[in-house]
Amino acid sequence: MEKIKQRLSDVAHSWTSIAVALLFLFGVQPGPDTSLALEANGESHREKMLVAKDEKQLKKETLERYSNAVYKPSEMLTDKELKELLWAVGFEGKALKTAWAVAKSESNGRPMAYNGNRKTGDSSYGIFQINMLGNLGIDRKEKFELRSNVLLFDPVINAEITYHMTQGGNDWSSWSSIKNGAASKRLDDFPNK
């Protein structure tokens, strides 16, 4: 019986030594101050890292799903799909609601939407109707490294470019649906769930 106790003690000591060595190697120093600081808000550092990783992974998977889809000209994203896509691109809070309302006003959420009415100064593509007419298109192709205007039919590319053009949803001055009030009429329809 004494030999069994000694062996168990040796095993426990070995595992404890391994655990301490691993903690030291990976920069986590055990101690009361660390534990208290990490759990000050009710979440451990590890939990926060997992949530951040999960959110980042979720955004990546969302973008891949929408970018790899094939859309018909009349097909539109549902209100929730559009919200999810815009969130994955980076829009948050008020900017997310505004982006959603602009996309609904401009194209009703249709990735394949196109307005080629040059009389009104349009050659506009995708969910945000990014205008590529004349020099504007040349400049935007160069700035956003677009090989072709057709790439703007990809809702992820369209939304990412819009995110950059609006400085994260803070400057919508290039969109007529903001200027004419059409987007603000859509805000009440934003899917809150």
Where are these regions (language model features)?
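Catalytic and binding regions of secreted/periplasmic enzymes and modules that target cell-wall glycans
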Residues: 98, 114-119, 125-193
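Extracytoplasmic and endomembrane cell-envelope/extracellular-matrix remodeling and assembly machinery
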Residues: 31-35, 69, 193
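Surface-exposed alpha-helical segments enriched in charged/polar residues
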Residues: 6, 87, 164-167
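Acidic, low-complexity intrinsically disordered regions
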Residues: 11, 83, 96, 168-171
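Extended hydrophobic/Leu-rich segments
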Residues: 4, 8-11, 58, 62-69, ...
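Export/targeting segments at the very N-terminus of extracytoplasmic proteins
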Residues: 21-23, 39-109
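N-terminal secretion targeting segments of exported proteins
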Residues: 1-57
